[in-house]
Amino acid sequence: MSANLLKESGPREVFCGLTSIVWLHRRMPDAFFLVVGSRTCAHLIQSAAGVMIFAEPRFGTAILSERDLAGLADAHDELDRVARELLMRRPEIRTLFLVGSCPSEVIKLDLARAAERLNEELQGRVRVVNYSGSGIETTFTQGEDGALAALVPLLPASESRQLLLVGTLADAVEDRLIHLFSKLGIESVRSLPPRQSSELPPVGSGTTVLLTQPFLTETARLLRDRGATVLKAPFPLGAEGSRRWMEAAAADFHCPEASVRAVLDPLEARARIALAPHREVLAGKRIFLLPESQLELPLARFLHRECGMDLVEVGVPYLNREQMAEELALLPDGTTVVEGQHVERQLDRVRAGHPDLVVCGMGLANPLEAEGITTKWSIELVFSPIHGIDQAGDLAELFSRPLHRRQLIHSALHPQASDHPVHA
């Protein structure tokens, strides 16, 4: 593949890494995420999670006041006090994540030192770690990368042979994948993050890592430093990507090819059947992916190769060429891939390209819809269970649905131009 790789910089339109707390706190019910930030940070997380604060969710915000920001108060002492009160009130917490934000980074609040102080005080009763969820230089999915990277140094050492799935998956999807790996002959499969933060998987030279998400660059680097082997494979989105992803693990564990085909061939055939009605809607349509989630390259590969869509432009917030090499190789020749964002210029290219569908952030969706451009929220793809060969049809439906909706609206507004009028 010879993609047209470009890079641009300028004003961006993305969520910050605090958003990842929404799925991480659901994944690890014995963990608590304490954001050190402003009231804006608190409103963002509460709104994104859809959880009222009186329901006692497993996240909260230590709000920096104007005195903190002006340097008139000792924010470190105040943070220690808030953390102690939280742990006394919530004794079920086993891991406390101190999460940095834009305001805490601006005033140079040392959360690493705060975590160290609290760990010394708690003496192992609760593990305290820290990472940055700031959106100053990152996009929202990198919050998970920061959280997992903070856990890697704490993983126990082991040379035992095992497969480690890295990246948050829906529980049902993860259970299904572990079952399929077992049928392939891979019995020892662990996950990071685990379902309980106190049950961290081991890592060492016998560990083979399969990344489930493309945005875990720092986590992958740290796992390599611990001796693990990180496999190169497309990511498990769609039938083709999921199969190649599982085949990479099967090859590393020397699973018999006949056994691999016996397991995966029927699944792929069933996935193709599930894809068929959505391909009828999507084939030949033009799609423009704006940069936000870092899922853009795997999605572009899936939408082109399995759904027949034409790629106008594929935007990515950041491009790790080594980690994304397998995805880049599967894109059609000449695909325009733009790293970074100058949102005004990209919107100009959207209007000039006349795409049938635009994948973008929530902040851009309504203005584009008002211009008559059909959109898909990129954040919905992060919250939906789309990984694995069994989910290929559901993934395609996420893109065919807005086009179908647009057609219904058009038919209702212009019944004389439609052979199939919509009745209330």
From Swiss-Prot:
One GO MF term attached to the UniProt entry: oxidoreductase activity, acting on the CH-CH group of donors, iron-sulfur protein as acceptor
Keyword Kinase: no
Pathway(s) of this molecule: Porphyrin-containing compound metabolism; chlorophyll biosynthesis (light-independent)
Binding-site positions, [4Fe-4S] cluster: 16, 41, 102
Pfam family, one: Oxidored_nitro
GO BP field: light-independent chlorophyll biosynthetic process; photosynthesis, dark reaction
EC id: 1.3.7.7
Keyword terms, alphabetized: 4Fe-4S, ATP-binding, Chlorophyll biosynthesis, Iron, Iron-sulfur, Metal-binding, Nucleotide-binding, Oxidoreductase, Photosynthesis
Entry's cofactor comment: Binds 1 [4Fe-4S] cluster per heterodimer. The cluster is bound at the heterodimer interface by residues from both subunits.
Catalysed reaction, written as an equation: chlorophyllide a + oxidized 2[4Fe-4S]-[ferredoxin] + 2 ADP + 2 phosphate = protochlorophyllide a + reduced 2[4Fe-4S]-[ferredoxin] + 2 ATP + 2 H2O
Swiss-Prot/TrEMBL cofactor(s): [4Fe-4S] cluster
Entry annotated with the keyword Repeat: no
Main function: Component of the dark-operative protochlorophyllide reductase (DPOR) that uses Mg-ATP and reduced ferredoxin to reduce ring D of protochlorophyllide (Pchlide) to form chlorophyllide a (Chlide). This reaction is light-independent. The NB-protein (ChlN-ChlB) is the catalytic component of the complex.
Family: Belongs to the BchN/ChlN family.
Quaternary structure (record): Protochlorophyllide reductase is composed of three subunits; ChlL, ChlN and ChlB. Forms a heterotetramer of two ChlB and two ChlN subunits.
Xref: PANTHER family: LIGHT-INDEPENDENT PROTOCHLOROPHYLLIDE REDUCTASE SUBUNIT N
UniProt protein name: Light-independent protochlorophyllide reductase subunit N
Gene: chlN
